[in-house]
Amino acid sequence: MMTTKPTFAVTLVTLFPEMAQAITGFGVTRRAVDNGQLQVETVNPRDFTEDRHRTVDDRPFGGGPGMVMKVEPLAKALQAARVANPAAKVIYLSPQGQPLTQAKATALAEQPGLILLAGRYEGVDERLLDAEVDEQISIGDYVLSGGELPALVLIDAVSRLIPGVLGHQDSAEQDSFSGEFENLLDCPHYTRPEVYGEQAVPPVLLSGNHELIRRWRLKQALGRTWQQRPDLLEARRARGLSKEEQQLLDEYIAEQPSHTAKTTD
């Protein structure tokens, strides 16, 4: 059933509005748009230029390579975005921003809406950031051609946390980094057939014992994180492992062939 007002509105300020179709045209986010739970609009800064070339960039003061996006068209584009999304926080996608984490996505999902500014070229005039942007967010320590892909990643991560978007609320809570799995990688998942080649589904998952399954999944999540992302495990330790979690992690490590070379201390 369509709602009369979207529960979450996102306005993407971009030179390439067609890229938003990756969100509005496919999968979970498309269903959220179709169901009125998510609204994604675009604003193109070129529509706010005053020359016949629709210029949005210029050479940097002080010299150097590349071009810098101009203040005026971006400021006008953001002002137009605020008309449609007045309570939204303005976020600039940038390698200089704070890392996008599950905790950050959860916090953003509680906002009334978002205005996302996707830069291009060498970046945007710093005066625009000082005057118009509330926060900068990065999706990783690497450089992309523009901010559109990071913006789409952010929209997808936040959309999953909007109530009702996923078919089952536990789907979001059992993702990596969420709920019981905060600061942990996800556990392994299996579906039919029960046997593929010489590989069988772990018997515990066929047992029907929900408590044993829960403990197995938590144990696997702890173990995977210990093996693949020890930095995340340290973050989990910082908030305190429960007695059960420490026991399950110790069991997992003891089961590994090379466990004597590693320690949980």
Swiss-Prot record:
Family to which this protein belongs: Belongs to the RNA methyltransferase TrmD family.
Functional description taken from the UniProt entry: Specifically methylates guanosine-37 in various tRNAs.
Protein name: tRNA (guanine-N(1)-)-methyltransferase
EC category: transferase
Pfam families: tRNA_m1G_MT
Coiled coil segments of this chain: none
Catalytic activity: guanosine(37) in tRNA + S-adenosyl-L-methionine = N(1)-methylguanosine(37) in tRNA + S-adenosyl-L-homocysteine + H(+)
Molecular functions (GO terms): tRNA (guanine(37)-N1)-methyltransferase activity
Taxonomic path: Bacteria, Pseudomonadati, Pseudomonadota, Gammaproteobacteria, Oceanospirillales
Main location group: cytoplasm
GO biological process: tRNA N1-guanine methylation
GO CC, alphabetical: cytosol
